[in-house]
Amino acid sequence: MARSLKKGPFVADHLLSKIEKLNEKGEKQVIKTWSRASTIIPDMVGHTIAVHNGKQHVPIFISEQMVGHKLGEFAPTRTFRGHAKSDKKARR
C-alpha cells in the first residue's frame, strides 16, 4: 500500500537539514547516512550521499531519474559470489 499523498515523502530530519544547509551554501560534500528508508527528493539531486549497507557506506550520486525512489534501493546489502562451479573431474 502506497504512502498517503497528504503526508508527503518520508525523509529523515537530520538528512533533510544537512541537504538544506549544503544547498544554501552551494557546496557539494559527501553526506553519510544510515537512513535507507528516506525517499529521494528533488533537493538532493546533484549531491553524493553515502548510504550504509550494513557493513560500509556506499557513495551514491543522486540524479534526476532517482527522485521518488528510496536511498536503500541503490546500496545492495548482499553480495552474490556465484553458484558453486561443477567439477567434472570429481564425477568420474
From Swiss-Prot:
Please describe what this protein does.
Protein S19 forms a complex with S13 that binds strongly to the 16S ribosomal RNA.
Q: Which organism is it from?
A: Gloeothece citriformis (strain PCC 7424)
Q: Which GO terms describe its molecular function?
A: rRNA binding; structural constituent of ribosome
Instruction: List UniProt keywords, sorted A-Z.
Output: Ribonucleoprotein, Ribosomal protein, RNA-binding, rRNA-binding
**Taxonomic lineage:** Bacteria, Bacillati, Cyanobacteriota, Cyanophyceae, Oscillatoriophycideae
One annotated GO biological process: ribosomal small subunit assembly
Alphabetized InterPro entries for the sequence? Ribosomal_uS19 (IPR002222), Ribosomal_uS19_bac-type (IPR005732), Ribosomal_uS19_CS (IPR020934), Ribosomal_uS19_SF (IPR023575)
Q: Which NCBIfam families match?
A: rpsS_bact
| Cellular-component GO terms for this entry | cytoplasm; small ribosomal subunit
**What gene is it encoded by?**
rpsS
Record-stated family: Belongs to the universal ribosomal protein uS19 family.
A Pfam family found in this protein is Ribosomal_S19
Protein name per its UniProtKB record: Small ribosomal subunit protein uS19
